[in-house]
Amino acid sequence: LDRRRRRPAKELAGRLLAPAFLGGLFLASVAGASALAALGDAPIRGMLWVARTADPARALGSVPTECLKIPADPALAARIEVGRAAFRTAVLLGGQAGRAGINCETCHRNGRTNPDFLFPGISGAPGTADVTNSLFSTHRGNGIDDPKPIPDLAGPKSKLKISQVPAEKKLEPFIHGLITEEFDGPEPTPAVLDGLAAYVRALDPAACPAMARQPLGVGLLMADVRRAMRAAQAQAASGDAATAVVMVASARSRLGLIDERYAAPALARPRAALRDADRRLAEAQGALREHRADAPELLKAWLARSGPLEVELNAGQKASLFNPALLSQAVRRRLPG
């Protein structure tokens, strides 16, 4: 076991957490500059935690297929959708991890593992993470470098650390500790915590598609956006505005993953449409927080306009960093060693 003392958390934080989010989207700070120049040498934030040895087309241009078993029970399926959306937003974790743009899916891509994850000061070999690092946690930091392999949450349940048997109720406190202690995150709403446990339990190796990976593109991310927004609608209808706000945050996070790949000057029009869509989501979040009567209508209206938005984004996808050739050019600029 490598028990080297690690670098101080503040030293790492200053270098890794400098880029800022505005309106839920990762925005270039230099107006009018080209995509690569505006975002320095890491136009896609995920490049900051991908090993230099990784195949960019696989690590940044595709994702593992999701092994999610959707139950016949509509109530349980709705809980799973809440957890699925929360799993994909940095708002859940908060703290330094949230400010770095990290969420559960950063390490567990589509609920799986991430063999290419290499976060400076947190990882040892690619695909490992030190969950007791004081950069992310003031509660569990132990001052010792001890990264462990990232588990595949869709692997055999018997190989996972915590029992997922619902009657044993071991998974919920474990996830709560991960959020509030391991990542210094805010207290999750009861529905979010319950949903996360339901989502993790629904990840099943028997539900894995025949195709191991799928291309990452506008269609996949917009599907995630709509699922999160439908979960927001359901939570708002039930009177749980706080959980609905988290669902909208997840939708905004997925739009952000599209936005950062549309930074080329030629994509100004679809990028403007993205920013307008994000502005309308921010308005819906505000309405939910204020318990305004127009919140449900704002959510409904956003979903109604999501189809034309996707059409416009698809039209520009070949000129974006979803294009494997352009992605490879961008990646050659920088990957951490």
Predicted segments with their positions:
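Periplasmic c-type cytochrome electron-transfer domains
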Residues: 4-6, 32-337
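Bacterial N-terminal signal peptides that target proteins for export
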Residues: 5-21
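Sensor of tandemly repeated, compositionally biased sequence architecture
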Residues: 11, 31-32
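Bacterial N-terminal signal peptides
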Residues: 18-31
